[in-house]
Amino acid sequence: MEVPKKILYVSGSIGLGHVTRDLAIAGQLRKQYPEVELSWLASHPATIPLKEAGEKLLPQADMYANDSVPAENAARGFGMNILKYASKTRREWAHNVKIFRQIISKGKFDVVIGDETYEIGISLSMKLVRLKVPFVMIYDFFGLDSVTENPIEKLGVYTWNWIWAKTDRKLLSGQKNLALFAGEPEDVPDTGLGFFLPNRRDHAKTYYKFTGYILPFDPAQYADKTRFMSQGG
């Protein structure tokens, strides 16, 4: 099988957790396939560690909308209402899809990787964006839960879960695209997604490939517990 040489890597979602594992994935890609060329698309603050690592950021990254802003607006204390975040970020998602469409229409890539880039996955499944090369989506959870008894929130959660399951079916039923789940099957609740919707874990096992945990360090370095504890004082 021919190894893809030019990869567009879109580090999505919020905060720095995703880009940390994305850099770990990029390191392993280069280790196994030294000829790989990575071009990155991300927004602040994910652009900071990417620049520090010397990665190639596309110029369009300066215009890529920041998902962290609507996330902060949806947060209360130490928690965040995911549904409220999803509703607040629609404008940013539409903007990012427009930029993504411009990039793939001009750039020649062999594969596109998206780390929780829901806006791209949905737009591809709805054929709002045409992508001729394979698309790889990375998840670390599946399905939303309502955090209150508000019927509007419950309906919104159900609608989002329906869209998510439908997107997976459309995007992942063939041999072209792939979804990776950063974790184990047990990390997906063995519960229903909603009325007439699939069981979460069964759905994940059907459509996702589980990678185990992606770590930005080598666990073997910490195998000697006594030495590790002594170094920590």
PLM feature spans:
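A nucleotide-sugar donor-handling region in carbohydrate enzymes
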Residues: 147, 155-233
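Short internal beta-strands
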Residues: 37-43, 139, 179-184
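A short, glycine/small-residue-rich beta-strand->loop->alpha-helix junction that serves as a flexible
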Residues: 11-23
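An aromatic- and histidine-rich active-site surface loop
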Residues: 46-49, 112-130
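Structural motif
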Residues: 6, 110-111, 178
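Conserved nucleotide-sugar phosphate-binding/catalytic loop shared by glycosyltransferases and other
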Residues: 4-5, 9-11, 32, 36-87
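Conserved nucleotide-sugar donor-binding subdomain of glycosyltransferases
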Residues: 74-120
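Active-site proximal beta-strand in glycosyltransferases
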Residues: 128-146
